[in-house]
Amino acid sequence: MPLDSLTLMIVYTVNVTAVAFGLSVALLGQGSRAALCAQAGALAQAIGWICLVASGFFRDTWGDQLLSTLAMLLMSLSLALLLQAVRKWRGSPCLPRALYLAALGMPLLYALGFHHYPWRVGLANGVIGAQMLWLAAEAIRPGAPGSWRWRSLIGGSMAALALVTFWRGVLGAFFTELYPTFATPHPVNLIGSLLNNAATVLTGIGVLAAFREEAEAQLKTLAITDGLTQVLNRRAWSERAELQLSDAKRYGHPMIMLMIDLDHFKQINDRRGHATGDQALQLTA
């Protein structure tokens, strides 16, 4: 049975919208910044593809240019947001705000050169492919926290999509007669459409797995630390002390224990209130 590029793109748009809705419901109300970035990225990707498919119904009109440019903006932004989420889950610093502004540069140049087809196709696919490659590299980068399971799902999906995206950009920029429209039934386009559907599902699973890992780490931290001072609680401290003492005895290392006591702490609570007493504990900790 022959595959139709436009039909595959419409199916993908439905799939990515469903995944965006599913992630929004699954992660609804979660305070994690990484989870919020992942939700926003999925939503931006879904709206971007809706705009791209809709632009095909306004061929050679101002609506085509407007919807296509908006699609490029949202797709670029979605990858930046997913990259931010992955970096947060891996314990890396946040992306500089300047990089978000840089994501606006491609859609602007895309709009200015919209009527030059090779330029806009090469530019858009080149920039988006580079973002995918960066995201894949960040996900599979060794040495940082994060289970290899969810990292391999996201990293592998993005690497495969980056390869096809670069290929599509080369065709549009240098072999335009082989790829005159985004719905052209070229093998690269068909492969890209199929990969999009698979990668969206795998990336969604990877995001949920990463969030679960983050939630488990938070629960573990809550179980072994004091909620006010964030220092080890009595149970965790006793377990840690036994291990340290055993190591000191085994290897003959000296060991020092320091105990800090706050004088007149009850008077602080009685005279200035428990809120001030809590602040004193936090300052000492």
Regions found by a protein language model. Give the residues of each.
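GGDEF/GGEEF active-site signature
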Residues: 279-285
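Hydrophobic transmembrane alpha-helical segments in integral membrane proteins
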Residues: 1-17
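Nucleotide second-messenger and two-component phosphorelay signaling modules
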Residues: 243-256, 260, 271
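Juxtamembrane segments at transmembrane-helix boundaries
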Residues: 18-37, 47-183, 190, 200, ...
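Conserved nucleotide-binding and Mg2+-coordinating catalytic segments in signaling enzymes
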Residues: 220-239, 260-274, 282
